[in-house]
Amino acid sequence: MAAGKDVRVTVILECTSCAKNGANKKSPGVSRYITEKNRHNTPGRLELIKFCPYCYKHTIHGEIKK
């Protein structure tokens, strides 16, 4: 049986351009995606290019703390 922490964790990705434009972190005007990552393969912060419906373009979405 596997012991220790779970390898796959749930992370939240937030639009970096919406966050830079002065939008509050908890406001509904910031695009967020929920996904999973493998801690062993990607120990650092995850960044993916996703579509932001508030910016109307593809932007970098970075991992945020819960």
From Swiss-Prot:
Tagged with keyword Ribosomal protein: yes
PROSITE patterns xref list: RIBOSOMAL_L33
Gene3D superfamilies in the cross-refs: Ribosomal protein L33 (2.20.28.120)
MF term (GO), any: structural constituent of ribosome
Pfam families recorded: Ribosomal_L33
UniProtKB keywords: Chloroplast, Plastid, Ribonucleoprotein, Ribosomal protein
Principal subcellular localisation of the protein: plastid
Domain of life of the source: Eukaryota
GO-annotated cellular components: chloroplast; ribonucleoprotein complex; ribosome
Localisation per UniProt entry: Plastid, Chloroplast
S-S pairs: none
Single GO biological process annotation from the record: translation
Family: Belongs to the bacterial ribosomal protein bL33 family.
PANTHER family: 50S RIBOSOMAL PROTEIN L33, CHLOROPLASTIC, LARGE RIBOSOMAL SUBUNIT PROTEIN BL33C
HAMAP family per UniProt: Ribosomal_bL33
UniProt name for this protein: Large ribosomal subunit protein bL33c
Organism (species): Illicium oligandrum (Star anise)
Gene: rpl33
